[in-house]
Amino acid sequence: MLVLTLGEPVSTFTWSMKEGEAKEYTPLSFYKEFLGNDLTNNYVMLMNDPSREFYKCYEIDYDRHSYDGKNWTYVNLPIEDIKEIAIASIKDSTMMYFSCDVGKFLDSKRGLLDPDNYDYESLMGTTFGMDKKQRIQTFASGSSHAMTLMAVDLDKAGKPKKWMVENSWGSTNGYKGHLIMTDKWFDEYMFRVVAEKKYVPAKVLSLIHISEPTRPY
């Protein structure tokens, strides 16, 4: 059915970079040259979900990329722990898979994610008092979009002020295809990062190797 609807996969393809020569690859040779890593065992998914207990490993049934693949397994951490891991990865020039609730307080023209972008409370004459935990529990917020977390702006004390992600909506959207998020927005609407294990503390890695991760649902 996939071949009928999408076409037969190519056996080779040509890959070229700006100011570089084109080179022909098979999918396997491309993987070996540009990745060369064990994508299954070399990474760990980290979640910030304050509605569930921190420092526990969770597994979601039937949330996988292929029928015979593994369920999503993640370690739930406080936001500050995730920030430390993300900063360590970025300082080592290693970008990360990142997911968030991208539609909240997004100014797409400026490419800015900031809870202070819009003053809904003054406009509506009310207050919105739910915190992140309550928004998750009432399904008012959740992970809706994945991007590449690639940069962070730190103050003199080494604390993050804002973050940059590379998006997939084209170069005319946001700042040349990128979005900037304030650290305040990161706290409220960031949900997942996938980091290489070498940036993750041993105490966090030890939580992955339990025999029966907790089912959150």
Residues of each region from the PLM?
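Cell-envelope/ECM-targeting effectors and their regulatory/trafficking segments
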Residues: 12-19, 110, 152, 202-203
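C-terminal soluble interaction/assembly domains
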Residues: 128-206
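Long, positively charged binding patches that form subdomain-scale interaction surfaces
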Residues: 66-147
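Single conserved hydrophobic/aromatic residue that forms the stacking wall/gate
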Residues: 208-217
